[in-house]
Amino acid sequence: MKVQPIIMFRKIILIFLLMVQGMFASAQGQFNNWFWSLGQRITFNTNPPTVIPTAASITSFAYTTAVISSPTGVLLFYTDGKVIKDAAHNTMPNGTLNGAPNIPVTYSTGKQSALIVPDPGNSNRYYLFIVIYYNSGGTVYKDLRYCIIDMTLNSGMGDVVSTSKNVFLASDVDGQITATRQTATNNFWILTHSNTTNNFSAFL
């Protein structure tokens, strides 16, 4: 999937994409495992869904999380936008995320500030899109960035591709991201909103 900037879009498109995303998310086992703040987890691999007790020390995320599983519902990895953890709840070797080079992420927060989509051209790879907040010289930056996670790395537990980590897409963004599949090419549209204007940015 090639990521490239497209033009700004209007608010009505966001509403449409949010509805489409809901339908897409319910269609595959890739979205059967959910994590949220302070160690809470639920799986939709069972009927009815099962709440899985998880120690807060394992998933002590306080803000937004994003999770991806295999097409059969096996957990692959998850993130809060600050670190990426594998299915064994270990931080991936290259999974600590930064803002500008060597500047730690302060936090990643918002209703949906981290989003994972599969690579349409490689079933072993996934794109993680994140809105990251970091402080540099007293100024707080809010950037949209992405990483590529390759599940063939780290003995099959997955890791961030070193040449595709924290790739910058846009600045001054709000803490919300959404996505929908482009039917003609099987790629994904990624949409976010400016933090200070009424503009939307879309990427394909």
Briefly describe each language-model feature range.
Residues 29-110, 118-121, 131-145, 149-160:
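Beta-propeller domains
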Residues 1-32:
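Bacterial Sec-dependent N-terminal signal peptides
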Residues 72-73, 123-126, 185-188:
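Short coil/turn segments that connect the beta-strands within blades of beta-propeller domains
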Residues 77, 128-130, 190-192:
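Conserved beta-strand element within WD40/beta-propeller blades
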Residues 18, 141-144, 185, 195:
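Residues forming well-ordered secondary-structure scaffolds
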Residues 114, 126, 144:
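A broad, low-specificity signal marking well-ordered, structured residues that form hydrophobic/aromatic
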Residues 161-204:
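Aromatic- and glycine-enriched pocket-lining scaffold segments that form the walls
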Residues 67, 114-116, 177-180:
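Hydrophobic core register within WD40 beta-propeller blades
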